[in-house]
Design a protein with these regions (language model features):
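Extended hydrophobic secondary-structure segments that form protein cores and membrane-embedded regions
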Residues: 20-27, 55-60, 93-94
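Two-metal-ion acidic nuclease core segments, chiefly of the RNase H-like superfamily
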Residues: 38-54
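Active-site beta-loop-alpha junctions of metal-dependent nucleic acid enzymes
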Residues: 1-14
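RNase H-like two-metal-ion nuclease catalytic core shared by retroviral integrases
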Residues: 55-77
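Acidic, metal-coordinating catalytic cores used for nucleic-acid/nucleotide bond scission
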Residues: 25-38, 59-65
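Alpha-helical scaffold elements adjacent to nucleotide-binding pockets in ATP/GTP-utilizing enzyme cores
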Residues: 4, 37-42, 70-75
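C-terminal regulatory/effector modules of DNA-binding transcriptional regulators
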Residues: 13-17, 44-47
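C-terminal accessory extensions appended to soluble enzyme cores
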Residues: 15, 79-149
């Protein structure tokens, strides 16, 4: 996810130069607010780009509220009956679908990540001091401050 954010950031910054990004996330383990590398990369991104990041997680089993789930449904209908025989075919079909009258921005993110890499407990404690977990919903609402106006 951070790779995609880094890829899209120049376009986003040119359009509106935001000082806050709101990211709505599902509860998948790969983007958990307890994943050390995920939080580390988001903190680095926020600081390097002078932007605050507000992460809000959808509750478990509430995919009906998550717009990306509706996009997946449209994409599945769009490529129904197609043989997904290559990455190029999948990307091409994704680029030609329409959702709410718009074509999505589709890019292939290249990257291979080593498994089992995590921050030390001390490094994670240091990171925890740079983020704010909203009281009462600590797992589902996290603010990362990087904007220095």
């Amino acid at each position: 996810m951070v790779d995609a954010l880094e890829s899209l950031w120049p376009m986003i910054k040119t359009r509106s130069d935001p000082h806050t990004i709101v990211i709505n996330l599902d509860n998948g383990p790969e983007n958990s607010s307890r994943r050390t590398q995920f939080i580390n990369r988001l903190v680095q991104f926020a600081k390097e780009n002078n932007v605050d990041i507000n992460q809000t997680y959808y509750p478990p089993y509430h995919s009906k509220y998550n717009p990306i789930e509706r996009v997946w449904g449209v994409l599945e209908k769009h490529w129904k009956g197609e043989l997904l025989t290559s990455v190029e075919k999948v990307l091409g079909l994704a680029r030609t679908m329409k959702w709410n009258g718009k074509n999505p921005i589709v890019t292939k993110i290249q990257g291979v990540y080593k498994k089992g890499i995590s921050l030390s407990q001390k490094a994670m404690r240091d990171l925890e001091n740079m983020i704010i977990r909203v009281p009462g919903i600590e797992k589902w609402a996290v603010d990362i401050w990087g904007y220095e106006g």
